[in-house]
């Protein structure tokens, strides 16, 4: 099997001044082609570090994608380091020098002398074209590995990987790309509790399971490698969904908001939202998607009691008798938000996100949630003790979305989730 | 000099399914303490890869922070790999087993058997406490290096680095901690335009400048190393602020929302928000902070025209004559939101976030913003062409916050930002 590694260069990546999105993009693009990266090394702009890492990793990998350090400034030294690592000199690549001169002429600019450096490649390098920038790519064979040098500018990297790198490794290593992936989105279960349920299953050969925590969700990834495993993927997925029950809330979606958005978009159905403790989170996550205006009518973040009365028409006596965090209040909030524009659905939340504001009867993490429809209202009051303010809010939003999702599927709206408690009515 | 490296583990980080924000956070936190990372290696969940990287890097570094792989599932194998790398066995740490049992008892849950694994540490390991999770940290000496193992959950990592790791390296390597840092938050300028203004300044010895892009903000970090430089830091900061003018919107705050929250908290002043294109972002960013209920009365995300009329009292004729994205509409939205609860201030936004919905007259990126006060209303219509939907929304929220910030300082509410255009009224 071909061993692929990545070397990321640049002080700003190593020092955390920028998050390395190139690395994540490259790895997930390779995954989609069925190729796993074995290791990624990130180094700064020090010549001796670069030489050392090229020499060292070229003993272990078959292909190494090197990203960054091809620019015109003094801290761009990938080509020089590669030449030194191989013990050869830098020579001017005529073709690229011509390309640079043409590029600057086309852009009506004079070429700074510093850009000439970008045409200097290690003697044994094979040039790799970059039609979208001034940094020339190249590849060099050292020890076991092909080192493939790419620019740090994201769209130049992407272009070069798609147009040059992938065809190159396909050809060079005769790759078989048969891989499939299914993602299940879950809420209300810890990673270990999900694993305890899944790990006893006997999975067919070629099928592996991964977990990714992205609170309030945990995503389960089912990888299938090879045609036989891919054919079995739907059956395995069905089995896992059965075992996990209400924990699974979406397939191949990143969040419940995306699932709701997809279901409501162009459905002709409309939604209103009244939020207290979730503070705009439910609304905001939907507005993130273009086209949400087709179904989302308004989201009313009625943080104060006065606003619940004035904007949503909650009865002041309800607030007095039951408090803002109560089933009667949140039901009136949902009904009020729905009635203003006669929406098909309205979601409402009211709770104590913390860290302060809890009482013995209603501690921090108590959240009332309601869904109003044209025919009635569903509500529950959940318990999320010992969660951070942010997690109380994001879990509450997830439960609210799930109530609506289940209503849209005409399933029971209120269900138990393993790690989420509930007050009896 | 102490050589610090980082090893990130986890298939989901290596494969790019998640961007490695832990790595960026750790590196920039170390930078703030005056310590540079030399190299970062990212490996997946394969035992032999982990063993190889521990053995190899322990020959080169003095301290290696290892992140991830301490969970209860079968793909968490950092402790096992470390034990194998050192040729010793895993033994149960009684103290941590007790901690786990107490943790689950306190949370009224039965401990899954899989969690027992989290108490198994390499024989020579020194346990490192994790008061905020079930993953036990530890450190092991191998060859030249101390390998320091930390959980992958971001807030557990952060807690352990601050409370345990930094004191440990301080003590072990006798580090000189004389470093100070000032952060300036900016909006409306590109990084190169900020650098063009700052780089001509002659900075005293020991003072260096860093930039961090966290859209819609760019943060400028002014590091001072040594007592002399620290003493000069206020003067240098003042000079840079003068040179940058309206670009600087806060000091030592991560976002403008945090600056507004700090100013309004317990001020006795109240705020209402009416959002259209920003879709709850302004409200939601404030609700993120505990205590925001002391000033935030409500945030009305009036996405549809009907909602602007019914909830905010916008005149239908205004919408007909000028459209939803217009100065008159956004002014009525702000005045309406303020009037409902007689708030001191109200912010309103209405714009075209894209990718669709633009016209020749009002292209994607056109956003009207208003601030209503007890004495009047300020408004402007800005142009944000060629920005993503998300950036149009976050820049609009930032400009709205800045209008309120400037009003609270009794400065001119509407000012020019270099990279943000504006329609003339």
UniProtKB/Swiss-Prot annotation, chains A, B:
Pfam families: CinA, MoCF_biosynth. CDD domains: cinA (cd00885). It comes from the Bacteria. SMART domains: MoCF_biosynth. Coiled coil: none annotated. SUPFAM superfamilies: CinA-like, Molybdenum cofactor biosynthesis proteins. Belongs to the CinA family. This is CinA-like protein. It comes from Shewanella sp. (strain ANA-3).
């Amino acid at each position: 099997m071909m061993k692929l590694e990545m070397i990321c260069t640049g002080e700003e990546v190593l020092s955390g001044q920028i998050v390395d999105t190139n690395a994540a993009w490259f790895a997930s693009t390779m995954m989609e082609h069925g190729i796993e990266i074995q290791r990624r090394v990130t180094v700064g702009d020090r010549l001796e570090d670069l030489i050392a890492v090229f020499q060292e990793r070229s003993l272990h990998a078959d292909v190494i994608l090197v990203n960054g350090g091809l620019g015109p400034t003094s801290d761009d030294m990938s080509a020089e380091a590669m030449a030194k690592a191989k013990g050869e000199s830098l020579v001017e690549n005529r073709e690229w020098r011509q390309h640079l001169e043409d590029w600057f002429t086309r852009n009506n600019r004079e070429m700074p002398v510093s850009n000439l450096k970008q045409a200097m490649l290690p003697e044994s390098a094979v040039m790799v074209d970059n039609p979208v920038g001034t940094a020339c790519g190249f590849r060099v064979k050292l020890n076991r590995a092909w080192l493939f040098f790419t620019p740090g500018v994201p769209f130049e990297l992407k272009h070069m990987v798609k147009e040059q790198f992938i065809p190159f490794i396909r050809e060079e290593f005769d790759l078989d790309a048969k891989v499939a992936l299914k993602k299940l989105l879950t809420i209300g279960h810890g990673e270990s509790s999900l694993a305890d349920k899944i790990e006893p299953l006997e999975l067919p050969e070629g099928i592996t399971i991964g977990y990714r925590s992205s609170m309030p969700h945990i995503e389960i990834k089912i990888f299938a490698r090879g045609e036989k495993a891919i054919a079995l993927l739907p059956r395995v997925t069905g089995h896992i969904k059965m075992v996990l029950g209400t924990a699974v809330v979406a397939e191949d979606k990143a969040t419940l908001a995306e699932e709701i958005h997809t279901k409501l978009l162009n459905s002709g159905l409309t939604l209103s939202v009244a939020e207290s403790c979730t503070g705009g989170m439910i609304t905001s996550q939907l507005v993130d998607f273009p086209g949400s205006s087709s179904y989302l009518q308004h989201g009313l973040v009625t943080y104060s009691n006065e606003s619940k009365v004035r904007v949503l028409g909650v009865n002041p006596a309800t607030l007095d008798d039951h408090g803002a965090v109560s089933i009667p209040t949140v039901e009136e909030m949902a009904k009020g938000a729905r009635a203003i524009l006669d929406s098909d659905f309205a979601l409402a939340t009211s709770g104590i996100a913390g860290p302060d504001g809890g009482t013995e009867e209603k501690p921090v993490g108590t959240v009332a949630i309601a869904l109003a429809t044209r025919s009635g209202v569903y509500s529950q009051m959940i318990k999320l003790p010992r969660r951070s303010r942010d997690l109380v809010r994001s879990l509450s939003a997830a439960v609210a979305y799930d109530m609506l999702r289940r209503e849209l599927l005409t399933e029971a709206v209120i269900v138990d989730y393993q790690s989420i408690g509930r007050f009896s009515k």
